[in-house]
A protein has these predicted regions:
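Key DNA-contact positions within bacterial/archaeal DNA-binding proteins
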Residues: 35
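Minor-groove-contacting beta-hairpin "wing" of winged helix-turn-helix DNA-binding domains
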Residues: 51-62
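Short, hydrophobic-biased segments on the C-terminal half of alpha helices
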Residues: 41-42
Length: 168
């Protein structure tokens, strides 16, 4: 298989995947190193393909639902509660954004759409002893969400307000 054929096959897999695919899994499948896959993804992006890197792997972002941004404020200990509320309302948490005084806007992709996704994310944070990115801003952060409707987004805002997590 040539490099061009491999990139085409990788893109095809990402297009049909229901969940992110790790660079390691793609490397094993195509009998190349993880670094080769990372390079292939970079070349696919350079060709104009929209490929998102999440903590669980690469994915093609879905174009369904309404995109909304919500401002939140809470401690790191409440991250799981916040994310559970979002996915329980039917939203996908696309990313988290903070405003850093030196670097400006920092965005980290998440792509969390279920309690399982949230649990895996929280487990990786705990295993790596990492702090949430919102620790940089005292807990203030934004999330970009994909919501099925305005009504769902309004319900989520009310839920987070009731939890004391909505920043306004």
């Amino acid at each position: 298989m040539t490099a061009v054929q491999r990139r085409s096959a990788i893109y095809e897999q990402l297009t049909h995947a229901d969940a992110p695919i790790s660079a390691t899994a793609l490397a094993q499948q195509f009998s190349v190193t993880r670094q080769v896959v990372v390079g292939d993804i970079a070349l696919l992006r350079a060709e104009g393909h929209s490929i998102t890197a999440t903590p669980r792997g690469y994915m093609i972002p879905a174009e369904t639902g309404l995109r909304r941004t919500i401002a939140c404020h809470h401690s790191g200990a409440d991250t799981q509660r916040e994310l559970f509320a979002m996915v329980d309302c039917g939203c996908t948490v696309l990313d988290v954004i903070v405003e850093h005084p030196v670097y400006g806007q920092l965005t980290a992709p998440l792509a969390l759409s279920s309690r399982y996704d949230v649990e895996q994310f929280i487990r990786r944070m705990a295993d790596s002893h990492a702090q949430p990115i919102s620790a940089l801003t005292g807990g203030v952060h934004l999330h970009t969400l994909s919501c099925p409707s305005e009504a769902v987004f309004a319900h989520l805002k009310a839920t987070l307000a009731g939890m004391g997590m909505l920043y306004d």
